[in-house]
From Swiss-Prot:
InterPro entries xrefs: SMIM10 (IPR029367)
Membrane-crossing residue ranges in chain numbering: none
Gene name for this UniProt entry: Smim10l3
Domain of life: Eukaryota
Name by which UniProt lists this protein: Small integral membrane protein 10-like protein 3
Lineage summary: Eukaryota, Metazoa, Chordata, Craniata, Vertebrata
Coiled coil: none
Disulfide bonds, paired cysteine numbers: none
Expression by tissue: Expressed specifically in salivary glands (at protein level).
Amino acid sequence: MATALSGLAVRLSRSAAARSYGVFCKGLTRTLLIFFDLAWRLRINFPYLYIVASMMLNVRLQVHIEIH
């Protein structure tokens, strides 16, 4: 009897973990798709937006190059 209950508890915990992981993956997939869609739509305008925002906020992209 105890073995059957422990087996049932293990199966329920696995299904709950799988269910929560599935919900997490669904939310993550939806978020990534939204960001990829946004990136695709802004592929032309992003450099202009970046330049305007960096000028407004006085932020510069700094690249450090070392030549040995």
